[in-house]
Structures are given as structure tokens and as C-alpha cells.
């Protein structure tokens, strides 16, 4: 994997049943789901169609609740066996999440994904997957209180060709290539009413091409020691069809010595690029190494190092009164983020694998972490470079995971103790930097994160589930006053992310009942109760 400096979620889609038709679903208080599957041609092809939707927003007005939140998604996959060595797959996903607050604004976001994959078996030791992927991420805000709608997004056209090669029973190779064409919509504004004083505005689309070659080796060195090592080469081209501002000394942000704050620089000109022009290019090597040593048949140790590069930046100004996400490519002013991560872990199982315990500690650093000047405005800003600076970040902590894998009661308990900080120092001795150049909490810092999931099977008809989540509140920055300069009122802030939102914890329980477990396959009635939510810090 590559292209991201945070976690990657690896999802495998379930294939439909190619022999017989099945349907199952669940009806809940706040949401329901349905999944149907069956053969397209017996033992040759299959289909799977699944959908989910929530409907709590239909009942909230009955309780005088103005806030609305709901989601819906649809997932389908078609598979067909051409012959003994070739299989093809077509999958489609569409999903939306909607949240509105007191009729003031509505936030809608979601993804559309189309994926065609060809699986080819060269021999019993070599096979490949060729994938063509289209994705469309949408993010929109309806701001009725100011009279306009705003949306942004990113479309990706992705080609992947991956190989798995079993050289021997001790050496397995994975190698391949990846090429992604990105089209960014930085923002578009439309008046939401006929009486709105807002003029329509569409920012210029941005384009980029991201390429990668990689190989990875899984090597069993001894009976107890296994090594995974590899190298990924990545290349990123920021493409043209754009008009870029030119600044004195290439600085789009300047430091005001008198006020001790960062401000937007005035452009001294513009430079135009054609669609075929390369505005900026980047190249990076990303090595990775992981070692696993089995102490005995119950326990093992592991250690790893990896470097990753992320060329896309998610701009999200958490100090803004409205939520906002804008994707932007690396370029002259937004440098690629480069991650170096180290981890050491220990694993042990107990009572013939009935219980297992995992422990891991980690430390990672990120170069070129995006930071924002005070008062940064991301909505319809065609000069984003005027409100961002390149800094750095670090995160460290430990994770514990305890599982119970067998018996009437199964589940897991996870705990993470961590620290996530960032720093943006001054570019010269005359600049104070963001937050006086000191380390401060990132918006994602959560000192404590506890989650519990448990399932108890009373009998074949009845089962009970519980989910508990506890998280330290998100860091926030509050203004502590204002001052006037040349007739302009300027807010004064405390140190960045010095305060926190209330601690968040919730408990959800559900009872599942299957009326005729041996006759009615897949039918399940579900009731769920939400017991706890936010709690104010003392």
C-alpha cells in the first residue's frame, strides 16, 4: 500500500453464491439492511446486492429535535468464471451521509466507486489482478443562513496491475504498478435562493497524475523468523490548465512583525499553464521492513519500519464555524507529506486460542504537515497557498487488544494511549511560527481511546450484543478577545488546540431474534438501544 500517511483500511468484498439464491436482512429502530445473492449462471457466475439505510431523521421532529442525521448506501458485485484461469468481477458502491443542524446548514458527503477486475492464473505459483477503478468523492454544504450552497470533490481514474508469485514455499513475491489520474474540484458556490445576494462562483479544476512501482518479499528465514521487505517508487506530476499566482521570494504567506501574525501575501503576477504542462513533479523511494519472530507456539514478537509518501492533502480548518473538507494536490507551496513509522509488538494466545492478547507501541514522524494561519478561509478560496504553511507532526503511543474467540460469549476489548502533535516553526529567526513555534495537539489527538464489543449467544434463537466507546475529547482553539488595527477588528486566540471538547462515550446494546433458525434463513429482528453519549468535562 502507499499514497497515505495514516491508516489504510483493507476491505475485501464478499462474492455472491453461484449455486443457490439467498436473502437476509435486519430491521432496527434507527436503520435496516438487506442483502440478496444468487447465481447468474450456476457454478459460473453470481451476483450480490446489498443496501443499508437509516431513518431516525423521520422521527426526530416528533421529539422537537431540529438536528437531522441519516445515511444510505448500496453495494453490488457481479462475478463470472470465464474459464479455469480467468475470472472477471464488476463491483459498484454508492453511499451518502447527511447531517443538518437547526436548519442552519446541511452537510452531505459520500463516495461513488466503480471497479472492474480481471483475475488471471498463469500457473499454480503465479497469478495477477488487473483493476480499472473509478471513484467520485463528493462533499457539500448547504448554508441557508448565508444563502448559498458549496460543494467540492475529487474524481480518480485508477489503473492497478498486481502480481503474486510463490517462488518457493519460503519466499513469496508481490509486485506491480499503479497509476491514478486525479481531477480536483476545489469548490463551487451557487446561491441557495432566488433572493440570495451570493454570486455563482466556480474555482478552476486541478489535475494530477500519480504513479508507482513496487515489490514486496515475504521471506521465511528460519522456522521461527519471517521477514517482509520491499521498496516502492512513487512519482507525482502536478498538471497544468491552471493560472497560478507568483509571489515575491516565492512566499505566499508573510509574517507581520508588528502584529506578530501571519498574513496573506499579495501576488506580483500570474503564470499560466496549458493542460499538457507539468507544473511540479516529485519522486520518492519508500522502503519498508517487518520482522516477526515466533517465541513458541503461543507467543511471538514483531518489529517494523516503513516510509510512505502522500501527495494529496485534505484541507480541513477545524477552527471554522462550519465543517469543511477540501482535497488539493501537492505543488509549489503544498509539499508531499512523508511518513517514517516504527513499531514493536508482542502477541500471545491463551487456553488453546480461546483468548489472545496483542500489544504494540509505535512512533511516527511526518514531514510537510499542512498548517493554517489564523483566520484561514477555505471556502471558494482560489489562492489556498496564501493561508497554509508546511510544518511537521509526530505521534507515539501504545495499543492493547484482548480477544475472546470462542464460547457463548465472544468479543474484544481495545485500549490506545497516544499523543499526536504538530509543529510549525518560523522560516527565519524573525518569525514566531504557529503557536510560537511550539509543539501542540493535532485536531486528531485522543489521549485515551477505549472500545469494547461483546456478543452473547443465549441459544439458537436469541443473541445479545453490546458496543461501548470512550474517547478523550477533540482538541479545540477558542478566541479569548479581539483588538482593533487600522479600523479592523481582529480576533485574538489562545494557544492552538489548548482546550478540549467534552469526553465522548456511548453504549449501544441490541437483542437479535431468529424465529425459526433451521427454516427461515437470514431473517433477523433487531432492536438497539443507545444509552450514553457526550459528557461534559469537570
Whereabouts are the PLM-identified features?
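N-terminal periplasmic accessory domains that precede
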Residues: 1-20, 34, 38
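Extracellular loop and loop/strand-boundary signature of outer-membrane beta-barrel proteins
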Residues: 20-22, 60-65, 99-105, 113-117, ...
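Transmembrane beta-barrel wall of Gram-negative outer-membrane proteins
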Residues: 28-55, 64-98, 106-129, 161, ...
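Repeated loop/turn-to-beta-strand initiation elements of outer-membrane beta-barrel proteins
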Residues: 44-47, 85-88, 124-128, 170-173, ...
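Surface-exposed extracellular loop regions of Gram-negative outer-membrane beta-barrel proteins
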Residues: 138, 183-195, 237, 244-271, ...
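Outer membrane beta-barrel strand-and-loop segments of large Gram-negative receptors
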Residues: 202, 210, 329-335, 341, ...
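Gram-negative outer-membrane beta-barrel transporters
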Residues: 362-365, 384-480
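Conserved small/polar residues in nucleotide/adenosyl-binding loops
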Residues: 529-536
Amino acid at each position: 500500500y502507499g499514497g497515505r500517511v495514516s491508516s489504510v483500511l483493507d476491505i475485501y468484498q464478499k462474492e455472491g453464491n453461484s449455486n443457490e439464491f439467498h436473502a437476509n436482512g435486519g430491521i432496527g429502530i434507527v436503520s435496516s439492511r438487506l442483502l440478496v445473492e444468487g447465481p447468474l449462471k450456476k457454478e459460473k457466475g453470481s451476483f450480490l446486492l446489498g443496501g443499508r439505510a437509516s431513518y431516525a431523521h423521520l422521527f426526530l421532529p416528533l421529539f422537537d429535535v431540529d438536528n437531522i442525521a441519516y445515511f444510505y448506501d448500496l453495494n453490488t458485485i457481479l462475478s463470472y468464471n470465464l474459464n479455469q484461469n480467468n475470472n472477471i468481477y464488476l463491483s459498484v458502491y454508492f453511499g451518502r451521509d447527511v447531517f443538518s443542524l437547526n436548519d442552519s446548514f446541511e452537510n452531505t458527503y459520500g463516495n461513488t466507486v466503480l471497479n472492474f477486475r480481471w483475475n488471471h492464473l498463469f500457473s499454480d505459483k503465479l497469478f495477477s489482478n488487473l483493476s480499472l477503478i473509478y471513484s467520485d468523492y463528493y462533499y457539500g454544504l448547504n448554508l441557508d443562513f448565508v444563502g448559498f450552497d458549496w460543494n467540492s470533490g475529487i474524481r480518480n481514474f485508477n489503473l492497478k496491475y498486481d502480481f503474486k508469485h510463490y517462488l518457493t514455499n519460503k519466499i513469496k513475491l508481490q509486485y506491480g504498478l499503479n497509476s491514478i489520474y486525479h481531477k480536483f474540484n476545489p469548490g463551487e458556490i451557487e446561491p441557495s435562493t432566488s433572493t440570495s445576494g451570493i454570486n455563482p462562483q466556480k474555482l478552476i479544476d486541478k489535475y494530477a497524475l500519480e504513479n508507482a512501482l513496487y515489490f514486496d518479499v515475504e521471506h521465511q528465514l528460519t522456522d521461527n523468523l519471517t521477514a517482509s521487505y520491499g521498496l516502492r517508487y512513487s512519482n507525482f506530476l502536478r498538471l497544468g490548465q491552471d493560472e497560478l499566482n507568483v509571489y515575491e521570494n516565492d512566499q505566499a504567506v508573510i509574517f507581520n512583525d508588528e502584529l506578530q501574525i501571519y498574513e496573506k501575501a499579495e501576488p506580483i503576477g500570474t503564470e499560466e499553464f496549458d493542460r499538457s504542462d507539468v507544473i511540479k513533479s516529485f519522486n520518492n523511494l519508500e522502503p519498508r521492513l517487518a520482522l516477526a519472530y515466533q517465541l513458541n507456539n503461543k507467543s511471538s514478537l514483531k518489529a517494523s519500519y516503513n516510509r510512505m509518501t502522500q501527495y494529496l492533502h485534505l484541507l480541513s480548518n477545524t477552527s471554522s464555524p462550519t465543517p469543511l473538507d477540501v482535497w488539493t494536490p501537492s505543488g509549489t507551496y503544498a509539499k508531499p507529506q512523508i511518513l517514517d513509522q516504527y513499531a514493536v509488538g508482542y502477541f500471545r494466545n491463551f487456553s488453546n486460542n480461546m483468548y489472545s492478547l496483542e500489544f504494540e507501541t509505535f512512533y511516527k514522524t511526518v514531514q510537510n504537515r499542512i498548517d493554517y494561519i489564523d483566520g484561514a478561509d477555505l471556502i471558494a478560496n482560489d489562492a489556498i497557498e496564501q493561508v497554509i504553511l508546511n510544518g511537521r507532526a509526530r505521534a507515539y503511543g501504545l495499543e492493547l487488544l484482548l480477544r475472546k474467540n470462542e464460547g457463548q460469549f465472544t468479543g474484544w476489548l481495545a485500549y490506545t494511549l497516544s499523543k499526536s502533535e504538530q509543529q510549525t516553526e518560523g522560516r527565519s529567526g524573525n518569525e514566531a511560527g504557529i503557536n510560537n513555534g511550539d509543539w501542540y495537539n493535532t485536531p486528531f489527538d485522543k489521549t485515551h481511546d477505549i472500545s469494547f464489543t461483546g456478543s452473547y449467544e443465549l441459544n439458537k434463537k436469541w443473541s445479545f450484543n453490546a458496543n461501548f466507546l470512550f474517547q478523550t475529547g477533540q482538541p479545540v482553539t477558542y478566541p479569548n478577545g479581539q483588538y482593533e488595527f487600522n479600523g479592523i477588528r481582529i480576533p485574538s486566540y489562545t494557544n492552538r488546540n489548548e482546550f478540549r471538547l467534552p469526553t465522548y462515550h456511548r453504549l449501544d446494546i441490541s437483542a437479535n431474534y431468529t424465529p425459526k433458525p433451521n427454516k427461515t434463513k437470514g431473517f433477523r429482528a433487531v432492536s438497539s438501544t443507545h444509552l450514553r453519549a457526550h459528557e461534559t468535562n469537570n
